[in-house]
Amino acid sequence: MLRHGLFKDRRVFDENYIPPELRVRRGEAEALARIYLNRLLSGAGLSDVNMIYGSIGRVGIGKTTLAKFTVKRVSEAAAKEGLTVKQAYVNAFNAPNLYTILSLIVRQTGYPIQVRGAPALDILKALVDNLYVENHYLLVILDEFQSMLSSPRIAAEDLYTLLRVHEEIPSRDGVNRIGFLLVASDVRALSYMREKIPQVESQIGFKLHLPAYKSRELYTILEQRAELGLRDTVWEPRHLELISDVYGEDKGGDGSARRAIVALKMACEMAEAMGRDSLSEDLVRKAVSENEAASIQTHELEALSIHELIILRLIAEATLGGMEWINAGLLRQRYEDASLTMYNVKPRGYTQYHIYLKHLTSLGLVDAKPSGRGMRGRTTLFRLAPHLPADRLIEVVDNIIQAKMASGYE
């Protein structure tokens, strides 16, 4: 009979949980924190803009965790020196304009700043003034930063004013008080910055690329979560090794700590549901299998443009309709029709259309192959990646498209 359950702290398995220490990428966190602290403790204030980015198509590789951990460490180290560094976190995907971004930042500072109905520039000025009056500093994480660069509702001038606020709205005492840590999906964000705000891109101090996790790194992460969140008698090293070998990038996995942690959590929940008081290898394998089957990377899909999502949906629709492969010409025709009739957006030209297809293929969402004999002319055939459930994917894509269109994204 199961009396106490397998978990001693379920929060450890939440997606937003930040561990008390980073056993993997501790050096990267220390290097980032040192950049902010060196300037701050020398009396130069905060004005740094640094960036963390991943690899194309890789999610769950610790970018947000590293950013939040670093900012927390900066705040704690500054407090020991008698300085107050406030922290703010904004997911830019959910904040489509400068007003919303500033409103979220102000809310986290706790300053009595009136934001409703106020112009964004006035809010920013009030924030700078409050930091001066209180002699505080502010370190802001802008997650999903590439969303800000692609948003039609955030002008280049707005981005420049925000990230170079000490130039546009200097503090009354001349001390820079706002720093930024940008978190982007991959290196393409730097290219977008060069196009939209080259003056800021050239001044990014530290650009940190995070690769996907290897199996030994995933084991270390899982071990920490198990120690903090599970009862001691619940798990054995072999259970963690099994999961880390499945997801480790060096073992053919996608290197996602997020998926590895979810698999461990699922295995424990299965054991609890069966009345067991510990894990078994068969349950771990079952959890991994179910986690793989249900694996739709919502985070990854949210980073796609509306046009990429429309194309992906059409390919999934073809799969659901029993079409193993769809040729590029027919897909193009369906894309044009769907763009105009279903989504009321102008379809992109052929060059951009093929760029979208290449991107979807590079992410592993779509398979592509040249047509064989028996087809008139040479073309390319596409299908949904076999590991993705078409019906569930369509449901997720529809929700994302609806949210993007409501926010003015293309």
Swiss-Prot record:
Q: Name one Pfam family in it.
A: AAA_22
| GO annotation terms (biological process) | DNA replication
Record key words, sorted? ATP-binding, DNA replication, DNA-binding, Nucleotide-binding
User: Where does this protein hold ATP?
Assistant: G60, I61, G62, K63, T64, T65, Y213, R225
Keyword Nucleotide-binding in the entry? The reply is yes
Q: Molecular function (GO) terms listed?
A: ATP binding; ATP hydrolysis activity; DNA binding
Q: Which SUPFAM superfamilies match?
A: P-loop containing nucleoside triphosphate hydrolases, Winged helix' DNA-binding domain
DNA-binding found in the keyword field: yes
Superkingdom of the source? Archaea
- Stretches that traverse the bilayer: none
What does the record's free text say on domains?
A: Contains an N-terminal AAA+ ATPase domain and a C-terminal winged-helix (WH) domain.
Family according to the record = Belongs to the CDC6/cdc18 family.
Q: Which HAMAP family match?
A: ORC1_type_DNA_replic_protein
Which PANTHER family does the entry mention?
Answer: CELL DIVISION CONTROL PROTEIN 6 HOMOLOG, CELL DIVISION CONTROL PROTEIN 6-RELATED
**Could you tell me what this protein does?**
Involved in regulation of DNA replication. Binds DNA.
Indicate what this protein is called per its UniProt record: ORC1-type DNA replication protein 2
Q: Which organism is it from?
A: Aeropyrum pernix (strain ATCC 700893 / DSM 11879 / JCM 9820 / NBRC 100138 / K1)
